Amino acid sequence: MEPCLEIRSLSAVLPNGQRVLRSVSLTVQPGEVRALVGESGAGKTMIGKAVLGVLPKSVRIVEGEMLIEGESLGRLDAKARRTLIGARTALIPQDPLTALNPSRRIGPQTTDRLVRILGWSGEKADERIRQLLQEVQIREPERVLKCYPHELSGGMRQRVLIAAAFAAEPRLIVADEPTTALDVTVQKQILRLIAQLQRNHGTALLFVTHDLGVVAKISQKVSVLYAGKVVEEAATADLFASPQHPYTRALIAATPRYTDPYASLMPVNETVLAGLADEIAGADRAWRPSHG
């Protein structure tokens, strides 16, 4: 069976030549949840944007290949690439408070993609969105579809965005830190909801996060990113049981422990900005935290 997503030696640079992604390779199998974890600036979101074809104009891919179900995105013209990405992938964005257009009702915003990209009738798209809103535990879907975003809470807006992502039965969903902007109680509900829908629909999930607690709850495989490079890759249970790279060990050690409320957080020291890693020979291998 073809991987849902395969990235082969992908590198990307800024206009000044600094590399933001360095020979990134990973695969996501059908129905698999793979987490991308690392601190801010590690390149997690950049990988997700590359897959979805929405890299900033200032970022240029200089080598490597991305394949969705065996089809190479780089070998397609722009229109065919947009069609493939639109039909087989979807995004759950980071901030539900800014992801929706404040001047449009929820209904048209969530059905647009189904009508324009997939060619569904308006009636079919409306029915599908109503069904998904019920799946994400929104009790009054008809009322919500008529609402403007400001009339809904942050948690409700994120549920709407999750419903929209799953509506077209994509093969792959990129979840870009989808709980970061929510309070802790709502975060748990949203994580549980994403995991449930992922299992029910059999959708592959590329889950971008800096939170190892989230990684432990939702993923089967993990890719650890440091300075734009995958420095460790493992099954989730194996990664926590026996982390191999010093950066991975430092991330795990820096996770807050609640056994001692007065304990200080362990810093992750001596980090390297992704763009500077090329200038420091062996930065991804030589990095060491000050503890452990």
Feature-to-residue mapping (PLM):
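Conserved ABC ATPase signature
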Residues: C147-L152, M156
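A short, surface-exposed alpha-helical micro-motif characterized by mixed small hydrophobic
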Residues: V215-K217
